[in-house]
Amino acid sequence: MWSIMLVILADDLTGALDCAAPFAGRGLHTEIALSVEAIESALQLRPAVLSVNLGSREVGAEAAPQATAAALSSLPSDIVLFKKIDSRLKGNIAAELDATPFHLALVAPAIPDFGRNVRTGFVEGFGLDKPLNVAYALGVHAERAIIPDTLSQEDMSAALATGREVGADLLVGARGLAEALAFHMTGRQRAEPALPEPGPALFVIGSRDPITLAQVEELRRAIVPDYIAAPNGRLERIARPQHSVTLIQATPDGKDDPPLLVSDRLAASIVPVMTAPVATLLLSGGATAEAVLKAMNVSRIQLLGECLPGLGLAYVDGQCIIAKSGGFGTPGTLCEIARIAMGEKV
């Protein structure tokens, strides 16, 4: 019986959701704190799993350790700690580990189910132009890290077992490691999907990841949603959604505004006039998801699971909220959600 709370520290919101989804989908009470300040209220609900958005992905390497330290100071000591990192090693990984006390870390950023593996210390596979050196991303902390080959989910489970045997007191990884741990905690091989109810949907795309851009193009081709461009977060038109699927996409306009500013600008434009009327709100990109939910005065959510791999789902005041990391999914991922919302596919 697993009795100690698992705490996941993620550098952005979609990461916090994605890493927590395997636990929620297996029936564990899973709370998401959208900020460090929301940890206290989430702890009062006594979840089995608490996933915290540090909001440190887009800040500098000097600020990232401060967010980590603030989160750790708000948490009880008797926890299992999981440092969620991007499977493509984005963000301030070494800086965040600077503020994380540990003796030995199991570092396993692979997501084998997505074709993204670790071999001889390098992340390779889907979404990568070249292998990425895991030890380099860890900096000085690589000296206290185990970086096993993980070419399959079975490898990931074996790596988790090895980490426990040798006394690793910090788990560092992404969805693949979370899947292995969720299976270990529950004994359930697969998570149950959580699906949105049919109804009008608003897709808000802030991510510029090539994987997401391909999904947007496929959605526009196959579904033909009402499309509204938002150059640097400024909507070309703002109106109550009138179609079954409305797609808002932040696009470049020649200026190099910071991603957080673009996301805040986008959120301020659409909340509440465009978000309130829809049954399903899909947010793509961690900064975008965080900004929109903050504008909606949402600080904490209970995660129910995923509707598709990498797409965490929760309900807030009866509205379905789906968040998607930029680097997840197939070209048809957004189309699948659109068809569910349109009542065409269950």
Where are these regions (language model features)?
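Short, flexible loop segments at boundaries between secondary-structure elements
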Residues: G115, G176-A180, G187-G199, E306-G327
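Conserved, well-ordered active-site substructure
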Residues: V278, A289-E336
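Redox- and metal-dependent alpha/beta enzyme cores, enriched for Fe-S-associated oxidoreductases
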Residues: P193-V271
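N-terminal short beta-loop-beta anion/metal-coordinating cradle
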Residues: R26-V49, N232-H243, L303-G318
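Cap/lid and interdomain-hinge subdomains that line or gate substrate/regulatory clefts
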Residues: W2-V7, G25-A33, E37, R46-V49, ...
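Gly/Ser/Thr-rich loops at beta-strand to alpha-helix junctions
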Residues: D12-G15, I85-A94, P112-D113, S152-E154, ...
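Catalytic cores of soluble, metal-dependent hydrolases
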Residues: P252-L282, G286-L304
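A short, acidic, amphipathic alpha-helical segment used as a generic capping/interface helix at domain edges
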Residues: E31-L43, M156-T162, R188, P231-R240, ...
